[in-house]
């Protein structure tokens, strides 16, 4: 679930379903229906910091009780799901590092310190009772140069395939991917790389 779509309080109801008397009441909730149909699932809440604070109440129910009751009174069992929350909270502590962080000699201690700062930042945002129910908080390293190059190659390959479907032939050298990756250095992942492909190539 892209949590940027659940920023308003009324949008949180979509996860559990509309209450009786409202449009879409008979459809059930997006989250509860998905788990009811596939109880052995990985449920990803992407960029959780963008969600309305009421989402934390839903997460507390999932993590405490292992189930949610939708607007129609049906229970969705989460005991066999893996729930992941992703966030950019604390990413500013990893910003400004030269690539590839963690691979140069002596940078492990620096990364550990930055990870601790990022985790503290996340703990300030989440309610304490929710943090207490999380199994683990993990900080991912910024993408290394070779990873960004591989992603650039994939994006360029997708662009070439789209062009071929429209009757055009595009080719590129490996250097193009490396240049795009160098331009796209960002502590926030590969989104900037997609923008570079859009701007510079498309």
Q: Language-model segments: which ranges?
A:
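AAA+ P-loop NTPase nucleotide-binding core of proteostasis motors
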Residues: 1-202
């Amino acid at each position: 679930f892209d949590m940027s779509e659940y920023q308003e309080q009324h949008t949180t109801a979509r996860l559990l379903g509309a209450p009786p008397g409202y449009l879409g009441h008979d459809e059930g909730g997006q989250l509860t229906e998905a788990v009811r149909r596939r109880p052995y699932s990985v449920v990803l809440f992407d960029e959780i910091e963008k969600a309305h604070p009421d989402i934390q109440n839903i997460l507390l129910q999932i993590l405490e009780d292992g189930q949610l009751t939708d607007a129609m009174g049906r229970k969705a069992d989460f005991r066999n799901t893996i729930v992941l929350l992703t966030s950019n909270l604390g990413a500013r502590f990893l910003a400004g590092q030269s690539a590839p962080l963690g691979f140069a000699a002596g940078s492990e201690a620096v990364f550990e310190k930055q990870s601790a700062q990022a985790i503290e930042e996340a703990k300030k945002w989440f309610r304490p009772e929710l943090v207490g129910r999380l199994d683990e908080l993990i900080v991912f390293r910024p993408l290394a140069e070779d990873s960004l190059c591989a992603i650039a190659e994939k994006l360029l390959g997708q662009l070439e395939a789209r062009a071929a479907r429209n009757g055009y032939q595009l080719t590129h050298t490996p250097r193009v991917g490396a240049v795009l990756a160098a331009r796209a250095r960002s502590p926030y992942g590969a989104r900037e790389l997609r923008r570079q492909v859009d701007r510079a190539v498309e």
